[in-house]
Amino acid sequence: MNIEEMKKIAAKEALKFIEDDMVIGLGTGSTTAYFIRLLGDMIKKGEVSDIVGVPTSYQSRLLAIESGIPVATLDQVDAIDVAVDGADEVDPNLNLIKGRGAALTMEKIIESRAGMFIVLVDERKLVDYLCQKMPVPIEVIPQAWRAIVEELSIFNAEAKLRMGVNKDGPVITDNGNFIIDAKFPRIDDPLDMEIELNTIPGVVENGIFADIADIVIVGTKEGVKTLER
Ligand code: 5RP
């Protein structure tokens, strides 16, 4: 099984948690894109009804509309029943790093409010500790980026401003901010680090998602595996 197939079987497994009348947080990224398309197919076939999707980014909003999923913003719904999203790293306690797609702030706002947060990954994303392979993305107020990069050196982080691809200059988030990618030596206490990073003035949100995932569905070469907290 290749990586795309692993992502797809994880996405398919998540459909088992979807019921009529649900408000669903729609994450960002290539794995969640499979879920959004499959959810759209379910709606078209009449297998589920009265679904509302709350997208976490322009990417997921456009894809949800294209897939025939009715969408709303967070302030238009009373509650989020379930949220489904990908991740860049998952540690053994199901703490996450997210934000490669620069959508971490809306993802955290929506997913922290969900009745159930389901994470979809392929087996490459499982790590022994956070920051083993990937940096922590940090959304920052543009003017503050240099001061924050300097401040991150206290944590021995290698931090750099994320630059655009097919765009000159830095990546601009859906909220009009910059992203700093900070590679820490390792993160032993994700909750503590998540809180600490958010106390730096100018930081809008960071990509450590500690103690928030309820279920992680992993696509592996052998099939799908479900991890629960
Ligand atoms: C976007 C994210 C993504 O969910 C994460 O980067 C995983 O993406 P993919 O499924 O494409 O590997 O956090 O901000």
UniProtKB/Swiss-Prot annotation:
Its EC number is 5.3.1.6. Substrate binds at T28, G29, S30, T31, D85, G86, A87, D88, K98, G99, R100, G101, K125. The keyword Ligase does not apply. The active site is at E107 (proton acceptor). It is an enzyme of class 5 (isomerase). InterPro entries: NagB/RpiA_transferase-like (IPR037171), Ribose5P_isomerase_typA_subgr (IPR020672), Ribose5P_isomerase_type_A (IPR004788). It catalyses: aldehydo-D-ribose 5-phosphate = D-ribulose 5-phosphate. Pathway: Carbohydrate degradation; pentose phosphate pathway; D-ribose 5-phosphate from D-ribulose 5-phosphate (non-oxidative stage): step 1/1. GO terms for cellular component: cytosol. One of its GO terms (molecular function) is ribose-5-phosphate isomerase activity. Keywords: Isomerase. GO terms for biological process: D-ribose metabolic process; pentose-phosphate shunt, non-oxidative branch. Belongs to the ribose 5-phosphate isomerase family. Homodimer. Catalyzes the reversible conversion of ribose-5-phosphate to ribulose 5-phosphate. This is Ribose-5-phosphate isomerase A. It comes from Pyrococcus abyssi (strain GE5 / Orsay). The gene is rpiA.
